[in-house]
Swiss-Prot record:
This is Nuclear pore complex-interacting protein family member A1. Belongs to the NPIP family. May associate with the nuclear pore complex. GO terms for biological process: mRNA transport; protein transport. GO terms for cellular component: nuclear membrane; nuclear pore. Widely expressed. It is found in: Nucleus, Nuclear pore complex; Nucleus membrane. It comes from Homo sapiens (Human).
Amino acid sequence: MFCCLGYEWLSGGCKTWHSAWVINTLADHRHRGTDFGGSPWLLIITVFLRSYKFAISLCTSYLCVSFLKTIFPSQNGHDGSTDVQQRARRSNRRRQEGIKIVLEDIFTLWRQVETKVRAKIRKMKVTTKVNRHDKINGKRKTAKEHLRKLSMKEREHGEKERQVSEAEENGKLDMKEIHTYMEMFQRAQALRRRAEDYYRCKITPSARKPLCNRVRMAAVEHRHSSGLPYWPYLTAETLKNRMGHQPPPPTQQHSIIDNSLSLKTPSECLLTPLPPSALPSADDNLKTPAECLLYPLPPSADDNLKTPPECLLTPLPPSAPPSVDDNLKTPPECVCSLPFHPQRMIISRN
């Protein structure tokens, strides 16, 4: 309105609708927004009017109009920029943002519709299949019943799979427990065997066989010292009766040092012959052959306790029961004629 009045005053009162429209269009096209110093006609009005109040009112009205145009944009789409490319970029950016938002909504809606359509098509296929199958038997089912049965079957299958998995887990736990028990049992067995081996090693061989070892050693020494042929049964029984009552074999609680049965023969038994038995028997005429008495038998090299061939020439008489053969004596001439071997005595002592 003020623009029209100023134009009419400058032009001398000519008033046309076309001139007012041109002025409004130019102001709206070139100077939209907060461009306060770019209006040449405003400077012309302030210079020629020379009125302070009119200039203040004109500036105030212009500020109000610019503020209102800034808040409420015009419909023609002009943003006050003369750069066509910049305006095109801005418009394209806004249009692309809007298109992006719209496309996301469209895709979301399309997915929902597609899901519904697929479910409906599947339902129609199931209904058609069931109806075609049951048409032969004179039956007709709906898709809901078939789906219900399918869901029941799926539930039963899932329940069976769950039970099988639980059984497998329980079986694995049981096998693990059994394996643990087996390991514990094997460890206990190994400890028991080690303990048995330890106590078995602590028992001396003489404690395991208290009579055989000493009888054999005594028989060998008797054979070497007397020169008699080695007769194991006769010598063993004779020595057993001559030794008389012996203490019981030591148990595991006794130590090896305190063992009364030793594998060594005392030195006094090597020097002196065995004493005669208390009970004389009828076999007192058992004598050594003359050829064996003249030459003492040397000890064998391999110590295999074999009878010399010269002693095999004269057969020995049959032996009586063990109780009768207790008077086995060594002739004194054989004892006197035996050479003294200190090395053998040292070995026997060791």
